[in-house]
């Protein structure tokens, strides 16, 4: 089991240390979906289609990203259901709103925190993101994360979120 724990452990840790109850629930949901996804993806059935679990993971990311953007859980859930009903594939929406939420957090941190620290963490995160060149032949992936890069990416995002919520 050398691939699944990294993102799940970071999400579990965030759900334990954050004070906001809604964030606790959303990160626990993301921890469970990420664990199932990576177990099923890499460890249990590496040759099977994993789209159903991938879809659940994308829904978790979408709700969390919308909550970060709107700061309203009811509105976030309603938008998520509208997107799910309207579109069959939601992964582009999940990634789009994730990036918008990340930009909102980074912009806020650049206004309130040490800019050199924030930019350094941002550079480390994107180096870890772009250093993934392992080709992956199974749907829905094109490129698989290296375990160390996944850990670095998720920790950087967690630091941003934790600083943002303080």
What spans do the regions from the language model cover?
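Multi-pass alpha-helical transmembrane bundles in non-GPCR membrane proteins
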Residues: 1-166
């Amino acid at each position: 089991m050398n691939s699944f724990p990294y993102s799940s452990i970071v999400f579990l840790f965030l759900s334990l240390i954050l004070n906001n109850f809604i964030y606790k629930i959303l990160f626990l949901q993301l921890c469970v979906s990420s664990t199932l996804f990576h177990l099923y993806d890499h460890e249990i059935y590496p040759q099977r289609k994993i789209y159903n679990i991938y879809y659940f993971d994308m829904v978790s990311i979408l709700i969390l990203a919308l909550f970060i953007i709107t700061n309203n859980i009811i509105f976030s859930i309603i938008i998520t259901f509208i997107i799910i009903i309207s579109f069959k594939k939601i992964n582009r929406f999940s990634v789009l709103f994730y990036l918008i939420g990340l930009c909102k957090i980074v912009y806020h941190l650049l206004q309130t925190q040490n800019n050199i620290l924030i930019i350094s963490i941002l550079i480390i995160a994107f180096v870890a993101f772009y250093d993934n060149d392992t080709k992956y032949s199974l749907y829905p992936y094109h490129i698989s994360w290296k375990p160390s890069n996944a850990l670095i990416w998720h920790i950087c995002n967690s630091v941003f979120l934790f600083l943002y919520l303080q």
